[in-house]
C-alpha cells in the first residue's frame, strides 16, 4: 500500500473534536434563535456537524454553487478551480456544450440585497464567461444555446 507523505501530513493536521452528546442536544433544537443562543453559551461558532462538513470539503478540495428557479433552489458540489462551463455541465451536458455565459452573484450579496432580483437591480449580478472560476457560494444562472 502506497502512502503520500504530503497527504498524510494534511490528515495529521486536521483533527476535530465533536461531542456526540452536545450534537444530540443541538439536533433537538428547532428554533434558530435558541440554537444560536445555545452555541454562544457553549462558546461555539457552529455545530460539530457543520465543522465536519466544512473540513471535509476543504480536505477534498470541494466547493458549492447554487442554482435557483421558480420550482427549486439547488446546491451543486464541484471541485475547486472548476470553470463555469464545467459547472454548468454538472446540471446537464447540453449546458456545457452550448455554454454562452453565466449570470453570477455571491450568496452573501443576494442575502444582503434581499433576493436575486434585488441584487440584479443593484447591479450585483455579473456576466461571467468560459474562463470564470466558480467560487464557493456563487449563485448562477446559465445561459446556453441548444
What are the language-model segments listed below?
Residues 11, 49, 81-84:
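Generic structural signal for well-ordered, non-membrane alpha-helical segments
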Residues 6, 34, 83:
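Short Gly/charged-rich anion-binding patches and loops
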Residues 144-145:
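Short, surface-exposed secondary-structure boundary micro-motifs
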Residues 20-72:
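Anionic-ligand-binding alpha/beta catalytic cores of soluble enzymes and soluble regulatory domains
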Residues 20-28, 72-141:
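Nucleotide-binding motor/catalytic cores of P-loop/tubulin-like NTPases across gene-expression machines
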Residues 13-18:
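Conserved beta-strand/loop subsegment of P-loop NTPase cores
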Residues 1-7, 11:
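Single conserved hydrophobic/aromatic residue that forms the stacking wall/gate
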Amino acid at each position: 500500500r502506497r502512502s503520500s507523505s504530503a497527504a498524510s501530513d494534511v490528515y495529521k493536521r486536521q483533527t476535530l473534536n465533536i461531542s456526540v452528546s452536545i450534537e444530540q442536544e443541538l439536533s433537538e433544537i428547532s428554533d434558530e434563535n435558541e440554537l444560536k443562543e445555545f452555541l454562544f453559551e457553549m462558546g461555539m461558532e457552529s455545530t460539530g456537524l457543520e465543522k465536519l462538513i466544512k473540513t471535509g470539503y476543504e480536505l477534498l478540495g470541494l466547493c458549492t454553487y447554487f442554482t435557483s428557479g421558480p420550482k427549486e433552489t439547488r446546491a451543486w458540489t464541484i471541485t475547486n478551480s472548476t470553470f463555469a462551463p464545467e459547472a454548468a455541465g454538472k446540471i446537464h451536458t447540453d449546458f456545457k456544450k452550448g455554454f454562452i455565459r453565466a449570470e453570477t452573484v455571491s450568496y452573501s450579496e443576494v442575502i444582503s440585497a434581499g433576493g436575486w432580483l434585488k441584487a440584479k437591480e443593484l447591479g450585483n449580478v455579473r456576466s461571467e464567461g468560459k474562463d470564470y472560476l466558480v467560487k464557493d457560494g456563487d449563485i448562477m444562472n446559465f445561459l446556453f444555446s441548444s
